[in-house]
């Protein structure tokens, strides 16, 4: 049975469809809960995130023509003498960022729904991931990006055959341009923010972390946050594990923003329940520089419910963390380095902390 979408604002339920990416009331959509997670149904012979196919909202076979082998990334301890501080190397996914998790599931579902075109907006990584999986599925794709996006990311999406449209202004301006272009019959808005199918892919991060550690969960996870794709997906996966009685207490979520653009962290510090837009003062961690995150309130709710925190790091801390990782053979982009900087600043002795290194250094030069 096809899973239903549920509006976060008015609770209206409706089937998944190609053209419907938000509720008629304007609200954000979630996907209703799916089957119970069962370790016994993990497909051990499938070395990708599709080993968890029994909890993914796609049919039994379509994924085989879309997958690029995404998932099952290494878990390592980069800091000498800190076996409690681990890094999940999601920058080793096919297009070099964690966004491949969401893109693989979203594009597979889009193909099953009969989409004849995809529209996405991105600061780089999500657009590249959608472009790659759209190419694999044979679906035309258009990606709207801020004009300030690094050329390396634009070139990658174009090589996958996507039409890339650079929009003057901010990340939010690019998203607005993409939304204005939606509405044609059969064209799906492949937004990693608005489309709940994307979170169904990023949730597999949690499943992998548990399986890699013998179905034990870490005490903390440290995740970069801009729009919240990674935080919300990870939370969804941990919730599925908790509902199945796996791994004990879900981990505390520490979400990391750049000091120069930190609207969710500002709301957390002030005790607010709503996230107010802020100014993007410019940061090397451009992948998390989102001044008005559409799901900011949801991220705030999830982090607080986990017992976690939202923290900020300076560009100086981010650059230093990037250099230290590179000196140990791990080259990541500034957005990932920001999370590592925050993780290294946390006190030791509170159990295992896992940081997701979300994007490769090649992405930003």
Locate each region found by the language model:
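PLP-dependent amino-acid enzyme catalytic core
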Residues: 1-365
């Amino acid at each position: 049975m096809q899973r239903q979408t549920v509006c976060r604002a008015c609770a209206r339920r409706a089937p998944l469809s190609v053209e419907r990416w938000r509720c008629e009331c304007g609200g954000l959509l979630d996907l209703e809960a799916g089957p119970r997670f069962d370790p016994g149904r993990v497909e051990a012979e499938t070395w990708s995130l599709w080993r968890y196919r029994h909890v993914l909202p796609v049919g039994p076979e379509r994924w085989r023509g879309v997958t690029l082998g995404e998932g099952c990334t290494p878990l390592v301890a980069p800091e000498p003498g800190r076996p409690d501080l681990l890094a999940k190397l999601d920058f080793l996914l096919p297009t070099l960022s964690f966004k491949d998790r969401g893109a693989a599931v979203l594009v597979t579902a889009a193909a099953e729904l009969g989409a004849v075109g995809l529209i996405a907006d991105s600061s780089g990584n999500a657009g590249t991931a959608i472009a790659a999986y759209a190419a694999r599925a044979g679906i035309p794709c258009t990606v709207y990006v801020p004009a300030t996006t690094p050329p390396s990311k634009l070139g990658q999406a174009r090589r996958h055959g996507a039409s890339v449209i650079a929009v003057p202004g901010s990340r939010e301006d690019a998203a607005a341009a993409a939304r204005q272009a939606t509405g044609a019959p059969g064209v799906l808005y492949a937004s990693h923010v608005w489309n709940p199918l994307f979170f169904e892919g990023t949730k597999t991060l949690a499943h992998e972390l548990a399986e890699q550690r013998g179905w034990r969960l870490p005490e903390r996870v440290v995740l970069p946050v801009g729009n919240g794709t990674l935080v919300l997906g990870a939370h969804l996966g941990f919730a599925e594990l908790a509902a199945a009685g796996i791994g004990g207490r879900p981990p505390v979520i520490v979400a990391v923003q750049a000091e120069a653009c930190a609207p969710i962290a500002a709301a957390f510090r002030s005790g607010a329940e709503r996230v107010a837009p802020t100014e993007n003062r410019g940061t090397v961690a451009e992948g998390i520089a989102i001044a008005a995150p559409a799901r900011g309130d949801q991220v705030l709710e999830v982090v607080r419910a986990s017992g976690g925190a939202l923290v900020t790091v300076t560009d100086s801390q981010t650059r230093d963390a990037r250099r230290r990782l590179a000196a140990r053979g791990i080259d990541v982009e500034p957005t990932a380095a920001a999370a590592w900087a925050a993780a290294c600043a946390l006190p030791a002795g509170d159990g295992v902390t896992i940081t997701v290194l979300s994007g490769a250094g090649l992405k930003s030069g």
